[in-house]
C-alpha cells in the first residue's frame, strides 16, 4: 500500500472515530448500532460530545422512544438521575414533536402535562418553564387557540403571516381581464371562463396573495392557465411550482410552460443540522434553500398548485423567498388531505379571510361531470351516492376481507382492466390507505412485482430489478445526472455496480448508497404518497383494517387520483360511508390563522 493511500485511510479512520465511539455507547445501552450513524448524520461530527452533554437530545431523532433515550443517558452518564432537568426539558419538546407527527403545530398545556406525568416528570410546570426559557418552546396565547408550540413551527407560522401581509402591501396591479361578449349560455366568455373563474384570475393579477380552491373538474387548471397567459401578456415573468414532481409536470402540461417542484424553485441545498457550538439550527426553516430574503425569486408572479400539501416550514421558506411586489397565487383543493408535515396552510389561509379566496363549484370536466368527477364532488360534499357508470369509468369491486381485497387488486391490474378497457398495467396505479397487512403497500408491491416484473437472477441488486416501478420517499435533487423529488414515480432502467438507475420522466437518476433507503416499489402507494399526482387508471383498495383510518379528506384524495378509470375494491363495509358523512378527520391545532389576524 502506498504512503498516500495509507495516509488517506488513517485520516478517514481518525475522522470516523467519534462515530465508532458513539456506536459503542449505543450498543452498551442496548440500542441498535445504526442509531449511532443516524445521530452523526443529524448532529454532525460532534454528535458524541453533544449527546454526552445532553443524552436526551437523542429524542430529536424520529422513531426514538423515551425509554431509548433514558437507556442511552444511563450509558453515557453513569448514575444520572431520572429527575435530571435536561430530561424534563427534552420531554416537553418530545411531547410537542409527537403532536406535530399528527399535524399539530400547537398543543394544549394539559396534554403536554399529561405526557410529562406519564413519563414520571415530578414538576411538569417547571419543565415547561425551562423549555420556554431555553427558547425551544413558545407559549402561545391567542384569540383562536392557546397552548404550547415548538419554536421552529411557531416561527414558521409567524413568518408566513408576516410575508402574506408584506406581499399584500407591496403588490401593484398586473392587469385585469374583462368579460367579453357573452355567448348564448350567458355564462362562459370567449376565454372559456365563467364569472367566478374570471374573478379568480383578477384576484391573482390584482392582489399580492390570492387563493383558488375547488374540486376536480371545476376548471382550476383553465383558470391558472389564463392567469399565466395574462401575466405574460403584461410583460411579467411567471414561476410555476408544486410540492411533487408529478404535480409539477402536470402543471407544466396544462399551462404549456415550465414548472418545477418547490424545492427545485427555491434551490434546495444540504442542510446543516447543528451549529458549531452545538445549538440546534432547525429554527431556520429556510436553511437548505439558496433562495430567501437575501436572494429572492426573480419572478413577478409565482403560482403554487396542490397547496393542500404545503406544511408550515416549506410554506414559510417559499413566502420568505418572494420579493416585495411579487404576486403569489395559491391553488389547491381544501377537501384533500392536509400536508404530511405539520400545519394546514391552505385551510388556515382560507379561514383567516386575510386574502381573497375563490372557490370553484361548477363541474365542467367530462361534459359537466363524468362518473369520477360526479362521485368526487358528492364525496367532497359529504355524500356517497350509488355509482351510475354504464361506460365503466367507475367500477365497484366488493371483497370480503383483506386477502380477497389483495387478490382482486392483482387481478384488476394484471388482467381485468388491461383486457376490458385497453389500459396497460403501466398506466394503472394502486392506492391504499395502509402499509401493513395483505392489502397494504408492502404486500401488494410484492405480489404485483411477482406478476409484472419477477426478478431476473443475474441482474438483481437488493430489492430492485430493471423494469421495477418505484417511488421516491424523500427529496434528492442532488442526485446525478438528474435529481428527483419526494413522490415522484419512476421505472428502474439499469442495475450495475451497486447503483440503480431510475427514469423519473425528467431524466435518469443514479441512486446508490444511503439514497436507496428513500426508494420503494411503487405499483402500490399510500393515499398520502399519491396526493398531487394523477394517473390514467387508479385502483383504490379499502380493506377492513383501513376503516379507522378513513376520513372524508382521505377518501376524496384517493378517488380524485384517477383521470380515465377508477376501480374501488371495497372491503371496509359501512366505514367508508361513515367517514364520508362525518368529516372524520380530527382538526389540526395551528396558530397561523390567528397570526394572519
What residues fall within each predicted segment?
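Conserved helicase motor core of P-loop NTPases
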Residues: 182, 186, 199, 334-485, ...
Amino acid at each position: 500500500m502506498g504512503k498516500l493511500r495509507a495516509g488517506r485511510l488513517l485520516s478517514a479512520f481518525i475522522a470516523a472515530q467519534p462515530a465508532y465511539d458513539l456506536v459503542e455507547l449505543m450498543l452498551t445501552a442496548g440500542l441498535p448500532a445504526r442509531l449511532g450513524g443516524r445521530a452523526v448524520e443529524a448532529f454532525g461530527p460532534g454528535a458524541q460530545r453533544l449527546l454526552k452533554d445532553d443524552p436526551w437530545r437523542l429524542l430529536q431523532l424520529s422513531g426514538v422512544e423515551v425509554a431509548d433515550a433514558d437507556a442511552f443517558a444511563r450509558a453515557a452518564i453513569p448514575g444520572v438521575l431520572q429527575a435530571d432537568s435536561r430530561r424534563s426539558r427534552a420531554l416537553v419538546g418530545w411531547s410537542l414533536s409527537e403532536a406535530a407527527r399528527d399535524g399539530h403545530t400547537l398543543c394544549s398545556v394539559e396534554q403536554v402535562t399529561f405526557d410529562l406525568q406519564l413519563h414520571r416528570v415530578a414538576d411538569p410546570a417547571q419543565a415547561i418553564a425551562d423549555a420556554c426559557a431555553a427558547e425551544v418552546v413558545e407559549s402561545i396565547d391567542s384569540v383562536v387557540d392557546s397552548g404550547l408550540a415548538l419554536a421552529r413551527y411557531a416561527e414558521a407560522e409567524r413568518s408566513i403571516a408576516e410575508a402574506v401581509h408584506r406581499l399584500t402591501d407591496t403588490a401593484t396591479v398586473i392587469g385585469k381581464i374583462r368579460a367579453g361578449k357573452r355567448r348564448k349560455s350567458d355564462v362562459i366568455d370567449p376565454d372559456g371562463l365563467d364569472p367566478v373563474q374570471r374573478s379568480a384570475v383578477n384576484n391573482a393579477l390584482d392582489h399580492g396573495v390570492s387563493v383558488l380552491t375547488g374540486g376536480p373538474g371545476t376548471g382550476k387548471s383553465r383558470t391558472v392557465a389564463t392567469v399565466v397567459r395574462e401575466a405574460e401578456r403584461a410583460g411579467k415573468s411567471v414561476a410555476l411550482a408544486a410540492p411533487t414532481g408529478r404535480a409539477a409536470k402536470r402543471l407544466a402540461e396544462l399551462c404549456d410552460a415550465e414548472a418545477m417542484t418547490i424545492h427545485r424553485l427555491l434551490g434546495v441545498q444540504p442542510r446543516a443540522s447543528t451549529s458549531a457550538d452545538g445549538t440546534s439550527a432547525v429554527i431556520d426553516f429556510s436553511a437548505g434553500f439558496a433562495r430567501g430574503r437575501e436572494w429572492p425569486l426573480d419572478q413577478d408572479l409565482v403560482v403554487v398548485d396542490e397547496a393542500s400539501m404545503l406544511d408550515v416550514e416549506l410554506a414559510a421558506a417559499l413566502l420568505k423567498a418572494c420579493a416585495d411586489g411579487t404576486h403569489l397565487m395559491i391553488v389547491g383543493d381544501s377537501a384533500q388531505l392536509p400536508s404530511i408535515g405539520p400545519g394546514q396552510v391552505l385551510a388556515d389561509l382560507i379561514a383567516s379571510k386575510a386574502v381573497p379566496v375563490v372557490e370553484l363549484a361548477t363541474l365542467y370536466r367530462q361534459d359537466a361531470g363524468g362518473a369520477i368527477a360526479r362521485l368526487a364532488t358528492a364525496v367532497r360534499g359529504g355524500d356517497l351516492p350509488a355509482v351510475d357508470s354504464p361506460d365503466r369509468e367507475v367500477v365497484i369491486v366488493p371483497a370480503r376481507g383483506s386477502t380477497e381485497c389483495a387478490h382482486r387488486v392483482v387481478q384488476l391490474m394484471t388482467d381485468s382492466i388491461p383486457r376490458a378497457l385497453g389500459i396497460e398495467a403501466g398506466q394503472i396505479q394502486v392506492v391504499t390507505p395502509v402499509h401493513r397487512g395483505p392489502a397494504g403497500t408492502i404486500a401488494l408491491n410484492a405480489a404485483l412485482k411477482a406478476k409484472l416484473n419477477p426478478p431476473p437472477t443475474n441482474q438483481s441488486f437488493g430489492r430492485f430489478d430493471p423494469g421495477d416501478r418505484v417511488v421516491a420517499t424523500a427529496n434528492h435533487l442532488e442526485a446525478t445526472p438528474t435529481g428527483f423529488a419526494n413522490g415522484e414515480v419512476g421505472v428502474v432502467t439499469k442495475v450495475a455496480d451497486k447503483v440503480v438507475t431510475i427514469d423519473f420522466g425528467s431524466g435518469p437518476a443514479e441512486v446508490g448508497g444511503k439514497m436507496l433507503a428513500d426508494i420503494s416499489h411503487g405499483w402500490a402507494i399510500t393515499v398520502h404518497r399519491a396526493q398531487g399526482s394523477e394517473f390514467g387508471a387508479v385502483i383504490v383498495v379499502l380493506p377492513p383494517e383501513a376503516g379507522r383510518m378513513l376520513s372524508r379528506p382521505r377518501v376524496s384524495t384517493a378517488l380524485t387520483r384517477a383521470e380515465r378509470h377508477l376501480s374501488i375494491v371495497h372491503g371496509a363495509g359501512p366505514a367508508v360511508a361513515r367517514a364520508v358523512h362525518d368529516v372524520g378527520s380530527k382538526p389540526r391545532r395551528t396558530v397561523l390563522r390567528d397570526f394572519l389576524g
